[in-house]
Structures are given as structure tokens and as C-alpha cells.
Amino acid sequence: MIPWLEADDPFPHVSSALTEADGAAGLLAAGADLSTGRLLQAYKHGIFPWFSEGQPILWWSTDPRMVLFVENFRISASLKKKLKKIHHSITSRDGQWEIRFDHAFEEVMRACAAPRNGEGGTWISDEIIAGYTGLHKLGYAHSSELWLQGKLVGAAYGVSIGQMFYGESMFARVPDASKIALAYLVHFLRNHDVSMIDCQQETSHLATLGAAPIARTEFISRLRQAVSGPQISNWQPIALFPHD
């Protein structure tokens, strides 16, 4: 059994989360709300919400935890070629490609929520969107966006607390658009002394980008130090190839 949280109840310790033997590995609690205060409390303790339509709010702390150390981010040769093409387009100001941060945060979330490849909608409900746009307005949630001829074609978004970034979701409307947006995000975070991105759950796609699972105890230890760092305030893309 997991505890049901009322509005003012604190989260249980992450060590009490269910295990694989319980049939819902990482499930910690249910209930409460998605207010900005509750979400910030959750992320600072290594907890995240994840639930489907019709379910109560479910809170998770997975073990192991999938993370991307920014120094391990993998850029394939083909992706690097695309990144250079986009870099030259941006620097020449030809009006084709643009990288923007936080220009259309809610639009990014709704694009991430849209059905993909004939599947149903994602876990990103209107309730989730409202909660995270609230964080965005307070400077705690951000998007890295790729634009082509004035249209949003790909992005990644997540939560930023101190020197910790929590990746939430990505989408692409043209090939590799989400990877390109992520590459600019990782580059920006590296330049602001962020060493680790929380990816929450293990997937083969994240592994190809350099993410790997670590023990929850190690994750929480690193997290505590990172969230106590200074909050990043100047969210502007940084050129990937400054000398080209």
C-alpha cells in the first residue's frame, strides 16, 4: 500500500517507494495536487508525478534512476553535421532555422502531449500542462525549441532548480528536431555548471544519447548538492560552434 496525500501532507521518504516485487517499481504516493509549491517540493526530493487520465495523481521515485551526465551526451556524426548546418543558418540570419528558449512553452507541452505514431495521447494532461506552465511563469520550467521558417518543429522541456535539470519530454516534427533542441539545451546547461539531467525512467532511446541508470541513493546524494546551487536566470541559447 502507498500513502494517500492530502493537501498539506509531506512526501514520504523515497526509500519507502514500491519495488519491482510489488508490481509498481518506484511508486511512492498518490493524491495531493500539482501546485507549484508541491511540484517544487517533489523535484527537490527526487520525486516526479506520472499518471494517466482517469487515475489519481501518482508520485514516483524510481530505482535505479536514469540520468544523463552532460559530459556523456552523445552527438553522432550525422547529427553533428545537421547541427553545423543549423548553426550556419542562425549566424547568417537567413531566416531558415532558429533556436529559441522559452518562446512557446505551453505550445511545446501541447505538442509533446499529442498522439504519436497512431498511439493514444500521452500522460501530459491539461492538469499537467497547467502545473508546469505555473512553474514556467516562476522561472522553474524551460523549453529549448527548434524553429524552421517561423514554425515550431521540435523541442525539449523540463524543470530547472539550482544546478539541477529534470528532463520531461521532447517532440519532433522533422527528423532529429528533438535531438537538436536537446543538444542546445545540454550545451547551455554545461555552460552553467549543470552536470546531470534527470531522465526519470530508463529507455533505449535515452541510452543512445548517453544516459545511464544510477542507484537512487547516488542520485539523491547528487541531487541534494545540485538543487542548493544558484538558480539559472539568463536563459538564452549559446552557439554550439562559436569559432566557425
From Swiss-Prot:
SUPFAM superfamilies: Acyl-CoA N-acyltransferases (Nat). Disulfide bonds: none annotated. It is found in: Cytoplasm. InterPro entries: Acyl_CoA_acyltransferase (IPR016181), Leu/Phe-tRNA_Trfase (IPR004616), Leu/Phe-tRNA_Trfase_C (IPR042203), Leu/Phe-tRNA_Trfase_N (IPR042221). It comes from the Bacteria. GO terms for molecular function: leucyl-tRNA--protein transferase activity. Its main location: cytoplasm. Its EC number is 2.3.2.6. GO terms for biological process: protein catabolic process. It holds the Pfam family Leu_Phe_trans. Keywords: Acyltransferase, Cytoplasm, Transferase. One of its GO terms (cellular component) is cytoplasm. It catalyses: N-terminal L-lysyl-[protein] + L-leucyl-tRNA(Leu) = N-terminal L-leucyl-L-lysyl-[protein] + tRNA(Leu) + H(+); N-terminal L-arginyl-[protein] + L-leucyl-tRNA(Leu) = N-terminal L-leucyl-L-arginyl-[protein] + tRNA(Leu) + H(+); L-phenylalanyl-tRNA(Phe) + an N-terminal L-alpha-aminoacyl-[protein] = an N-terminal L-phenylalanyl-L-alpha-aminoacyl-[protein] + tRNA(Phe). Belongs to the L/F-transferase family. PANTHER family: LEUCYL/PHENYLALANYL-TRNA--PROTEIN TRANSFERASE, LEUCYL_PHENYLALANYL-TRNA--PROTEIN TRANSFERASE. Functions in the N-end rule pathway of protein degradation where it conjugates Leu, Phe and, less efficiently, Met from aminoacyl-tRNAs to the N-termini of proteins containing an N-terminal arginine or lysine. This is Leucyl/phenylalanyl-tRNA--protein transferase. It comes from Janthinobacterium sp. (strain Marseille) (Minibacterium massiliensis).
